[in-house]
Amino acid sequence: MFRSMGTGTGTKPPAMTTERYEFGPLVGEGNFAKVYLGRHRATGEEVAIKVMDKEKLVRLGATELIKREIAVMQRLRHPNVVRIHEVMANKRRICVVMEYVRGGALYRYFRRGPSGGAAGLREHEARRFFQQLVSAVAYCHSRGVFHRDIKLDNLLVDEQGNLKVADFGLSALADMERREAHLQTVCGTPLFLAPEVFKRRGYDGAKADVWACGVVLYVLLTGRKPFPDEHVSRLYRLIGQNQFQCPPSFSPDLARLVRRLLQPDPDRRITIPEIMEMRWFKRGFKEVTYYIDSNDRLRSLDGLDGEPELYDSDTDTIESSSSSESPTPVAGTPRGMHTSVSAPALSELDRMEDSASLPLPLPLPPRPRMPRPKSLNAFDIIASSPSFDLSGLFEERGERMRFVSGAPVADIIAKLQEIAGMVSFTARTKDCQVSIEATRNGQKGALAISAKVFELTRELVMVQVCKKAGDTAEYRRFCDNELKAGLRGLVVDALPPPVEGGGHGGAAAAAEAE
């Protein structure tokens, strides 16, 4: 079934060189890309590999669309959103390696009615999928992403029966909306378009997504379209006039929710937080509870038999794409191709001339132990601080913070665990990394923080703290009110002088020499 990448035409894999993946059959094809089933050679994991021809993208004017899709997928780490593993490119093609969702499209699971047509799903099944859809959309909005093309074709089901939102090619980012006051582009599938979208008066991306969720829910429950006219202009008129009927089988709670979802006035339409408070929605709803483990993989706390269910993800692409650390090669990188688990911007790929010209911000590999760093970059940054007071040593950059300590690693880890316990957070420790997670989930997901300890010298370590998930304001409050105060006694208030001929003297001397 699988073959090495490099031979064949048509439905066979394109001629590219890779040591990481084997290619299987063609499983999908669109205007801009072909999607192949693939398998990671080392792990055996099945993946979907989206292959795009760079010349065709330019010819069809699709370069910006693909850039946006990759940028959006970099932002998203949620169990109900299809995840991206890595991006590879050579002079001719771009390959996006993604999660393979074996179950296929959601509409395949509709029942058959007496006349042979689709009859939708049972109410409890539709509710479960709708709950997962709303959870995913709420998370996307919290990350500043509006999907803009929510429809049944873009809702997949995995082998465990969980919904996965896919295809962010038409999505918009919140900063686009802020620049333009409202989104202007009419995009998406007519049946799922909110009335304000096709009226071309500007629209709120979040409210348009809520409308599309309402259409999805109606179709899930009935197997029919709420606005059944096939002619686009008449369809738009039905949508604008809100001409749809809830079947008698709908309970009052369900009918109330559907009418609020399909409210043509966006200012009166229900919001995501309000959906989550509706009685029909809350029935049996279990919030997605997940955390990012010490290997940067997404895990659910709701797995079977008390074991965490694994949502595998090789790296936190959000963090790694802005990492200031030195690039480190990934083992098994394909010859003749670039690879980045953090998905490099396509503007860089477009400028690429040869296979050695693209510097990629790859994340550091996991450190099961605490080896001496080969680079003294972190030490140099601290040693060159203008003062050695506490505020200077708690160096903060966006969603990252780091400080230097002379305390034993075991004491630092114990203190981090203690601080987490004081605010009822959980703490998981593996080697020299502590993962701290909030026990309650908000609209933006549970706050998750990673604290890694690195050895600088025999006497000093650096602790790097970064937000992995959740609300940024909540992260900063935790750092300001809990973390800094709790760690105050462990942070060095002055770096020791260099020791000639031993200790950390070589490092300090190098720093002073600069």
Swiss-Prot record:
Region of interest (Disordered), ranges: 303-340
EC top class named in words: transferase
Active site, renumbered: D149 (proton acceptor)
Cofactors that this protein relies on: Mn(2+)
Residue ranges with Acidic residues bias: 304-317
Spans annotated as PPI: 398-427
Region Activation loop: start-end pairs: 167-196
GO molecular function terms attached to this record: ATP binding; protein serine kinase activity; protein serine/threonine kinase activity
UniProt KW keywords: ATP-binding, Kinase, Manganese, Nucleotide-binding, Serine/threonine-protein kinase, Transferase
Domain (NAF): residue spans on this chain: 323-395
Annotated catalysed reactions: L-seryl-[protein] + ATP = O-phospho-L-seryl-[protein] + ADP + H(+); L-threonyl-[protein] + ATP = O-phospho-L-threonyl-[protein] + ADP + H(+)
InterPro entries: Kinase-like_dom_sf, NAF/FISL_domain, NAF_dom, Prot_kinase_dom, Protein_kinase_ATP_BS, Ser/Thr_kinase_AS
Domain topic, free-text comment: The activation loop within the kinase domain is the target of phosphorylation/activation by upstream protein kinases. The PPI motif mediates the interaction with the ABI (abscisic acid-insensitive) phosphatases.
Record's function text: CIPK serine-threonine protein kinases interact with CBL proteins. Binding of a CBL protein to the regulatory NAF domain of CIPK protein lead to the activation of the kinase in a calcium-dependent manner.
Record-stated family: Belongs to the protein kinase superfamily. CAMK Ser/Thr protein kinase family. SNF1 subfamily.
Name of the protein in question: CBL-interacting protein kinase 25
Organism expressing this protein natively: Oryza sativa subsp. japonica (Rice)
Gene: CIPK25
